[in-house]
């Protein structure tokens, strides 16, 4: 008795060659709908599913494989006499190989399918057959990915059957595949049919392996890069690499952080970043000048940094960037000349990202792993209106200082807390990240500012991601000659801080909104 294979695929890639091979090996093929049409066209002998079930496909194909004569043939254990007896009593011939891939739900969603179209792309029979076959992998080979045709074909050709090891691996892959498929459906329907003021009791997320990495944050750590099942266009995951070796774990983390900063600026802007903190941000009327500002902000820390430009890289800008060592440059595009210049540097990584979709990326939730769980939050992308800010001091900020405050407030929310930043209206001057007390961060930012040209420091302001708990911060700021501060306010000692500012003639604005970043 010849062995039987059931083939029902949406993705026809490679199926003709595979079907021809197993037919030559003596397998009987059962097929459905569109798959049968393809096999018939290639004159590959096959049996329609309704010839096996004695029941026609119905409801536009919604019901065709959900039948005991199919699932009994898949689930019957060959090592149990009772199962084999039941198969014989009901005239069911076992099916030994299942080749199924599912309706293109993800592809239809990414193409903007309507709700009605999405519902029709929810596969029922396919996952059922895959799960039945995978459950009975002791006897049944199940294939859900065209990439596995070759290894199955190779074993069948050599031994007449597949090894238990391969069947186990393919079964595990099936359950990963169907779980991912269902997770996308759950995610879509949860967004389409939300329940007001409640959180889903289950969080179903799915990610696809994008890149295996040499190591993680440190060489002793293993790591891989997975991309969301529903890709975000403006992201490092969807970047296109033009030059250089593959990204490392730390590269991906830093590039993601730099892209988030660049997203907040509409004017020509260059972001330089090291170890998840900005070391230079510059904005100008053109990208070359913006590079100059970002570089001058900290010409030491930028060495080996991650650079994001929100305009095309020009020849002039490339010439300047090529003079120092940079890990990564990301931009919407590169001029031909710029690409030629930068590609001469073997160790640099050049990438492009689609900046036209940056607003859409703001909707993606941030997921952070902790031991035993996940934290999920919205991104810190609230649109603030500076007209609603409150001047807390007697001294009013000048127009130039207000422009600098807007710039500082955009930038400081990307500095690790306790985060302090000193800027003028177009350039960061000093960054004080990640200290466990705020005055420590203030001192670092001011020290970095002290070596800047006096002209750069004119109209400089200081931004703080959270309130000042004590007036000692203001003492340090006054010593450095800073005359304007932007911060959220909200401390029980706000009045002490205000009085200190008034004492030193410093203008201070409260935004009413904190921007911690951990």
UniProtKB/Swiss-Prot annotation:
Q: Which organism is it from?
A: Lactococcus lactis subsp. cremoris (strain SK11)
Q: Which GO terms describe its molecular function?
A: IMP cyclohydrolase activity; phosphoribosylaminoimidazolecarboxamide formyltransferase activity
EC number assigned by the record:
2.1.2.3, 3.5.4.10
Q: Which residues form a coiled coil?
A: none
Entry's free-text remark on domains? The IMP cyclohydrolase activity resides in the N-terminal region.
**What family is reported?**
Belongs to the PurH family.
Q: Does the keyword Secreted apply?
A: no
What transmembrane ranges does the database entry give?
none
Pathway(s) it belongs to? Purine metabolism; IMP biosynthesis via de novo pathway; 5-formamido-1-(5-phospho-D-ribosyl)imidazole-4-carboxamide from 5-amino-1-(5-phospho-D-ribosyl)imidazole-4-carboxamide (10-formyl THF route): step 1/1; Purine metabolism; IMP biosynthesis via de novo pathway; IMP from 5-formamido-1-(5-phospho-D-ribosyl)imidazole-4-carboxamide: step 1/1
**CDD domains per the UniProt record, alphabetical:** IMPCH
Cellular-component GO terms for this entry = cytosol
Tell me what reaction this enzyme catalyses: (6R)-10-formyltetrahydrofolate + 5-amino-1-(5-phospho-beta-D-ribosyl)imidazole-4-carboxamide = 5-formamido-1-(5-phospho-D-ribosyl)imidazole-4-carboxamide + (6S)-5,6,7,8-tetrahydrofolate; IMP + H2O = 5-formamido-1-(5-phospho-D-ribosyl)imidazole-4-carboxamide
**Which keywords fit this entry according to its UniProt record?**
Hydrolase, Multifunctional enzyme, Purine biosynthesis, Transferase
Query: This protein is called what?
Result: Bifunctional purine biosynthesis protein PurH
Kindly state a single biological-process term from the GO annotations of this entry. Answer: 'de novo' IMP biosynthetic process
The MGS-like domain sits at 1-144
């Amino acid at each position: 008795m010849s062995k039987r294979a059931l083939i029902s695929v949406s993705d026809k890639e490679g199926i003709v060659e595979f079907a021809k091979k197993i037919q030559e090996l003596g397998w009987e093929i059962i097929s459905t709908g569109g798959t049968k049409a393809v096999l018939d066209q290639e004159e590959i002998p096959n049996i329609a599913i309704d010839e096996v079930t004695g029941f026609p496909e119905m409801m536009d194909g919604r019901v065709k494989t959900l039948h005991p004569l199919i699932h009994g043939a898949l689930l019957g254990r060959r090592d149990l006499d009772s199962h084999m007896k039941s198969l014989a009593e009901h005239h069911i011939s076992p099916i030994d190989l299942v080749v199924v891939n599912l309706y293109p739900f993800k592809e239809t969603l990414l193409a903007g399918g309507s709700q009605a179209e999405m519902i029709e792309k929810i596969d029922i029979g396919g996952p059922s057959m895959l799960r039945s076959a995978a459950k009975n992998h002791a006897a049944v080979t199940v294939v859900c990915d065209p990439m596995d045709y070759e290894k199955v074909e190779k074993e069948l050709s050599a031994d007449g059957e597949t090894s238990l090891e391969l069947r186990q691996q393919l079964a595990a892959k099936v359950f990963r595949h169907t779980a991912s498929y269902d997770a996308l459906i759950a995610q879509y329907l949860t967004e389409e049919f939300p329940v007001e003021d409640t959180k889903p009791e289950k969080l179903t997320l799915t990610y696809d392996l994008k890149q295996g990495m040499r190591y993680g944050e440190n060489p002793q750590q293993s790591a891989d890069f997975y991309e969301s099942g529903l890709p975000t266009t403006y992201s490092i995951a969807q970047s296109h690499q033009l030059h250089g070796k593959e990204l490392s774990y730390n590269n991906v983390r830093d590039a993601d952080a730099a892209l988030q900063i660049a997203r907040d600026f509409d004017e020509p802007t260059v972001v330089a970043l090291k170890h998840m903190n900005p070391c230079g941000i510059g904005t100008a009327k053109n990208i070359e000048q913006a590079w100059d500002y970002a570089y001058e902000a900290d010409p030491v820390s930028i060495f080996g940094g991650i650079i994001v430009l929100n305009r095309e890289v020009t020849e002039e800008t490339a010439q300047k960037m090529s003079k120092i060592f940079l890990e990564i440059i990301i931009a919407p595009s590169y001029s031909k000349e710029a690409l030629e210049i930068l590609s001469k540097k073997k160790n640099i990584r050049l990438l492009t990202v689609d900046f036209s979709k940056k607003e859409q990326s703001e909707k993606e939730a941030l997921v952070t792993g902790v031991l035993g769980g996940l934290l999920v939050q919205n991104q810190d992308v609230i649109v603030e209106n500076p007209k609603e800010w409150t001047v807390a001091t007697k001294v009013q900020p000048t127009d130039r200082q207000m422009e600098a405050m807007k710039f500082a407030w955009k930038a400081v929310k990307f500095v690790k807390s306790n985060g302090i930043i000193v800027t003028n209206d177009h350039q960061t001057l000093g960054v004080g990240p990640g200290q466990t007390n705020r005055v420590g961060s203030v001192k670092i930012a001011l020290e970095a500012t002290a070596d800047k040209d006096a002209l750069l420091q004119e109209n400089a302001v200081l931004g703080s991601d959270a309130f000042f708990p004590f007036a000692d911060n203001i003492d340090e700021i006054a010593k450095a000659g800073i005359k304007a501060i932007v911060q959220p306010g909200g401390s029980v000692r706000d009045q002490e801080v205000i009085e200190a500012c008034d004492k030193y003639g410093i203008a201070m604005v409260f935004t009413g909104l904190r921007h911690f970043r951990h």
